[in-house]
UniProtKB/Swiss-Prot annotation:
UniProt-recorded name of the protein: Universal stress protein A homolog 2
Gene Ontology annotations of biological process type: response to stress
Function as written in the Swiss-Prot or TrEMBL entry: Involved in stress response.
Localization of this protein: Cytoplasm
UniProt KW keywords: Cytoplasm
Signal sequence bounds: none
CDD domains according to UniProt: USP-A-like (cd23657)
Species for this entry: Coxiella burnetii (strain RSA 493 / Nine Mile phase I)
Pfam families: Usp
Family from the record: Belongs to the universal stress protein A family.
Main location: cytoplasm
Record text on subunit structure and interactions: Homodimer.
């Protein structure tokens, strides 16, 4: 592997899914004196708004965003990652990850893979899109038991 200096970890904010990614990121950053960056995308809930009224979708989205920020801060504090090296935004994960990787100038993106069948199921649609859209290296870490 190259000498990575900026590593972006795309988190699901699920302890079982994130643990292997965080462990791999810690291992790689310690060996290379690299900076870690964290990202999580809260998907738009426009379909909920249509079904239950716009306010319902917006309220749920705001609640999910606040909860995600809280969980992200907990993970970041455990890893000693400053607030300017973490982001939680609303939008499609694949686009937000690629955009933020470019903005931060990262040289490695770490994503989770699920190990099912076929490339789409193996990586998942977000990981697959990141793999094919990234201008830097992408490391897919196997999520056991998913």
């Amino acid at each position: 592997m190259d000498n990575y200096k900026k590593i972006l970890v795309a988190l699901a904010l699920d302890p079982n899914s994130d643990r292997p990614l965080v462990e791999k990121a810690k291992e790689l950053s310690a060996n290379r004196d690299a900076q870690l960056y964290l990202i999580h995308a809260v998907e738009h809930l426009s379909s909920y708004g249509a079904a239950y009224g716009v306010a319902a979708g917006v309220d749920v989205e705001d609640m999910l965003l606040e909860e995600a920020k809280k969980r992200m801060n907990e993970i970041a504090s455990q890893l000693n990652i400053s607030s300017d090296h973490q982001i939680v935004k609303v939008g499609p994960a694949k686009f937000l990850i690629l955009e933020q990787a470019k903005n931060w100038g990262v040289d490695l993106i770490i994503v989770g893979s699920h190990g099912r069948h076929g490339i789409q199921l193996l990586l998942g649609s977000t990981s697959n899109a990141v793999l094919h859209g990234a201008k830097c290296d992408v490391l897919a870490v196997r999520i056991k038991g998913s």
